Regions:
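P-loop NTP-binding core
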Residues: 1-204
Length: 204
């Protein structure tokens, strides 16, 4: 922000489960305003991550559910975006606006940006309402964008993890949410392998 370079490894925490984290803090809330008058504001995060990418196989950016400058920064540096959508009517309505933002970023900033898929979260298949939202999103977008078969169910145990400071795999390793994320990981990786095969076949 102030033109000073960031030392390598600054702010990175090494977690016992084998991942590195850069946690957010309360100051992030004011960063959105600070970016308004910043030169090259859409690529501030890219400048930081370009130096760190060589150290990692994958970097995951967890964005807030908003379409502000922080989210635009994440889209500007990302290779692909996985879009989580809560199984609620208002979240489903907001999906179209997010997709428009992705298209705009692709046109103006990051032409290589791809949509990995849509992930339904906090689902409850036991209720008619939950099934209706699932059908609504799959019906509206499933022909254009991959909607993952695996969903992430609503769970009290998952809601507890922020308070206990553990991942769902530590806190409730055999629970339905942990199992759902394992299944999702397999689905994402399988989808990526299919895409790589299609690219290889086109190149022959």
């Amino acid at each position: 922000m102030n033109g000073q370079s960031i030392p390598p490894g600054e702010g990175i925490l090494h977690h016992a489960e084998g991942v590195d984290l850069i946690p957010a803090n309360i100051e992030l809330a004011g960063l959105e305003v600070s970016l308004v008058n910043t030169m090259n504001r859409e690529k501030m995060l890219k400048q930081v991550l370009d130096g760190a990418k060589r150290e990692y196989d994958f970097i995951l950016l967890d964005c807030t559910p908003s379409l502000g400058m922080l989210t635009v920064n994440a889209l500007a540096v990302a290779d692909t975006t996985l879009i989580p959508v809560q199984a609620q009517y208002l979240s489903a309505k907001g999906l179209e606006q997010l997709l428009q933002t992705v298209q705009k970023v692709r046109r103006q900033i990051n032409p290589k940006l791809k949509i990995e898929g849509i992930l339904l979260t906090m689902t409850d298949s036991r209720t008619n309402y939950g099934q209706q939202i699932d059908n609504l999103i799959r019906g509206a977008y499933g022909s254009k964008i991959k909607v993952f078969d695996q969903t992430i169910p609503r769970s009290v145990r998952a809601a507890e993890i922020s308070a206990v400071g553990k991942s769902i795999f530590q806190h409730d390793p055999k629970g339905k949410v942990a199992e759902a994320y394992r299944s999702l990981t397999k689905e994402v990786m399988a989808n990526a392998e299919k895409q790589l095969k299609r690219v290889a076949e086109r190149g022959r």
